[in-house]
A protein has these predicted regions:
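Bacterial N-terminal signal peptides
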Residues: 13-26
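N-terminal secretory signal peptides that target proteins for export/translocation
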Residues: 1-12
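C-terminal functional module detector
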Residues: 28-29, 33, 46, 52-56, ...
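A metal-dependent hydrolase metal-coordination microenvironment
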Residues: 31-199, 204-208, 229-233, 237-243, ...
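Short, surface-exposed basic-aromatic patches at helix termini and helix-loop junctions that form
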Residues: 57-61, 210-217, 280
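Catalytic-domain carbohydrate-binding cleft regions of carbohydrate-active enzymes
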Residues: 223-224, 248, 265
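Structural recognition of alpha->loop->beta junctions
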Residues: 210-230, 287-296
Length: 426
């Protein structure tokens, strides 16, 4: 475990200085567009229950512009046959696969026991079968599935070039750092744009804010994951991932470690039965404002923070300047919207309390309510926050009154998370 941190000096504004906002808007060149994508998805290459091509076609039909299949500790770059009777939903999935893609595409054979086997297509094959330049993009990815003792630690690598095995380590933070380093080293070695992100910190109560706050080379965190086991909202003893994000942001920005952006993903595994017990598609996604639908443009925009995360709320525009952060929400009839502008001000209370382990697992420390406080709450479709000048960062969370179509928990409504605008950084 990392040592608990102290906000020495910086809490009084002594070591903070005005910083640029994380995203800016081009004054020339092609007009940017919003592109919808999911960067955490599973198929028969690991523990998903559908063929890659069928999964991608479904996202395409739902209006997604880009998708990454991120199977556990594997890339789709080798010959692999699956036995239909051994895979979940095998017979039904094979029928749909054959109907959609035809017998010339679906390769089948019988094993020595007469059981039907199907060859899983490699990435180059399945991506080319559904990709449509300028309209639908497929990225090669991996969920690096690691652990420390009993704690599951997962890092996604988006647009990866070569398989990265779990790197291991001597603590939670050490494992995560090694896995992040491996992705970033591959990027340097191959000169291929790619990035890592830390997955579902509350899954298995594996990752605390203290584990995340001093990591290097990680600019993204799943603030929402649609799997029913990941505990986005926390509980009475564990903070929500939203709260973890604010704790991490405050520490990093007051210690010169840089911003972390929030992502939403669905972490889909189950594509047939849609209910709250299944990890279904289309529960969470990112909307990226990029000049074109290419891998480079999507990654550039995300690394600049020019995207938002959503479970259903649509934003037409996000604008920030030296004076304000302004949103334009795409409203629906009969739906109300309230936007919370959230941040931490210089001079915040640095009080911190370590908490006892719960069932042998560390728990995120307790911090002042000054961290990630609600700076303003604005109803309507055009919420704006005028900077007071002492904010370290400001982010926005939009809450609608419209229920999500396939909730994990009763009462879930559609949300959107706007990336933090960094006002003051060490």
């Amino acid at each position: 475990m990392p040592q608990p941190f102290l906000f020495e000096g910086v809490a009084r504004g002594v070591r903070v200085a005005l910083a640029l906002v994380p995203f800016a808007f081009a004054a020339c060149g092609p007009s940017p567009h919003w592109y919808k994508g999911n960067l955490h998805t599973h198929s028969y290459w690991s523990d998903g229950n559908q063929f890659p091509e069928v999964i991608l076609e479904r996202y395409k039909d739902r209006g997604y512009d880009f998708v990454a299949l991120s199977d556990h500790n594997v890339l789709a770059d080798s010959e692999r046959w699956v036995t239909v009777s051994d895979i979940p939903n095998g017979t039904t999935s094979l029928g749909e696969y054959s109907s959609a893609f035809g017998p010339d595409w679906v390769e089948q054979r019988q094993d020595d026991s007469g059981r039907t086997q199907v060859r899983l297509k490699r990435f180059e094959e399945y991506a080319s079968s559904v990709a449509d330049p300028g309209k639908f993009l497929v990225l090669q990815s991996e969920e690096i599935t690691d652990h420390f003792e009993s704690r599951p630690l997962h890092v996604n690598a988006t647009n990866i070039a070569e398989l990265i095995p779990p790197q291991g380590g001597a603590s939670v933070a050490d494992v995560l750092q090694h896995d992040l380093d491996a992705v970033n080293e591959q990027r340097r070695a191959t000169d291929q744009p790619m990035f890592p992100h830390v997955n579902h910190p509350n899954y298995g109560w594996a990752v605390t804010a203290e584990d995340l706050m001093d990591l290097h080379g990680d600019r993204f965190l799943e603030v929402y994951n649609g799997h029913p086991l990941v505990r986005n909202e926390g509980d009475s003893l564990h903070p929500s991932v939203d709260r973890i994000w604010d704790i991490v942001l405050t520490h990093r920005l007051t210690h010169g470690l840089g911003v972390v952006y929030g992502m939403a993903v669905d972490d889909a595994h189950h594509y047939e039965q849609m209910d709250s017990t299944r990890a279904n598609p289309a529960r969470g996604w990112v909307m990226v404002r990029a000049k074109e639908l290419t891998t480079d443009a999507i990654i550039d925009a995300m690394e600049a923070g020019d995207f938002y995360a959503s479970t259903g709320v649509v934003l037409d525009d996000i604008q920030s300047s030296s004076k304000r952060l302004a949103l334009r929400i795409h409203g629906e009839d009969g739906v109300t919207y309230v936007t919370q502008f959230i941040g931490t001000r210089a001079g915040f209370d640095t009080a911190e309390q370590a908490l006892p382990d719960v069932e042998g697992l560390p728990v995120t420390h307790r911090y002042s309510a000054d961290i990630g406080t609600v700076l303003a709450e604005v109803p309507g479709l055009d919420p704006t926050y005028a900077f007071a000048g002492d904010e370290i960062y400001v982010r926005a969370r939009v809450r609608s009154s419209k229920p999500v179509a396939n909730p994990v928990h009763a009462g879930e409504v559609q949300l959107a998370w706007v990336q933090p605008v960094v006002r003051r950084a060490n």
